[in-house]
Amino acid sequence: MTALTTEARLELVDAFTGLGYKVYTAVPNVPTAKSIVIIPDTPWITPSRIGSTLNYEVFWKVIVTVSPRNNDAAQLDSENAVDTILAAIPNPYTFTRVGPPQLTDVGAQGTVITTEINVSVRMKEN
């Protein structure tokens, strides 16, 4: 049996695959520009169990990275990435917040621009 959290994460991976971004299902050592990183949000799981069936809402951070090449192009790339990803979020997932683009240092590899999208979905055991 696959965990409900795993099912939820993999549904997002499937939705984002083919959009032109490298999709990471866990935190990479070094995120590349033009990628999507899916990680647990806080809270990660909010239970709502009634009876014996497992039932909860799971929350994810979808972090989009783009190259910081120059300010104008990076801003446009971030805006286009957000629109593309929001359109690809499947039903019944909801997005609750989109953070502003920000420079993120990734060590010796330099910096990337990251934008955080918060999504959630209710999962129920069959």
Residue ranges and their predicted role:
Residues 34-37:
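A short glycine-rich, His/Asp/Glu-containing loop-to-beta-strand
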Residues 1-31, 42-126:
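Charged, amphipathic alpha-helical segments and their flanking helix caps
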